[in-house]
């Protein structure tokens, strides 16, 4: 059985972008007059694609369209085969994106049954359907329904069997579930919004920390879930990659240590100092700064400030960011020239719960930078 998503863009308006000779590579045909790149693009309020989900029975060579109760302007961000051949999981979103439905569709009868409805305030984050994983007759995904992003465990009929993680912190990644041991592997910001650590939760609900270094940790697990590669870094430590045992977190081998890189760069880079402060409205924000090496607190210095603060983003992290911006090279150079370089994660940035992240809803450009 095959399944796919079909997009009918025939009624979607065309958007046009001018193109010029000075593009790279050079567009010689636009030497005297600019050209245009035309494509289908639904701006806010314009007609969306008509979306449908189809299946193809390889044995009988029959194509069918699922009877999916999707709004005319709705979305289908994901489809997943399950272990049950009569259940194809189809994820839908309304255009407002504050309601996510997970349907179990029969590929042959085309009937669709609602399994889970996720309705939250303002919008469903991408992490909800992006984290969705299926294991036998169960599935799991990350939801912020509690006010923070946590992992939830369902059976294929849509019954919630367990909230895997709990607390006033966000789960950042769901790595997978070990069917044999009943362990859920994930990363979270439990220790600090600036840091991540790798954990697993066992059958009894007990939590076990696998990463040992303080900073930013990310993992890639083997298909057997017995081993994982842990990539650790901090503001002062380039990435260190180790192979670890998934049951104990014990390091089995160091694959990359970047020792020489650290020795060569440390004398050249300025020191990131993390800080927090409260705005005039009492909102606590996180930031970092790099000061001149001969900094004198009694003197005044010009300040260069980097700001992004897009929804769910993070620039203030205890992580090695060399090679990115703001990563350290330019900032350290400007500090050597007598500037203080600062960066602040404004309102609406990530790892601080749903209320903080979604406060910029319908206020983009207003609250992000204040």
Role assignments for model-derived ranges:
Residues 1, 14, 85, 217-370:
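Serine-hydrolase catalytic core recognition
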Residues 1-5, 29-33, 37-45, 50-52, ...:
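Conserved beta-propeller blade repeats
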Residues 1-65, 250-262, 315-327:
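Predominantly five- to eight-bladed beta-propeller fold
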Residues 11-17, 50-52, 97-103, 147-152, ...:
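Structural motif
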Residues 52-61, 109, 306-310, 345-348:
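Glycine-rich, acidic and aromatic/proline-enriched surface loops and short helix-turn segments
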Residues 57-61, 106-110, 155-159, 202-205, ...:
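Short loop/turn segments that connect beta-strands within beta-propeller blades
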Residues 64-67, 112-117, 161-166, 208-212, ...:
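Beta-propeller fold detector
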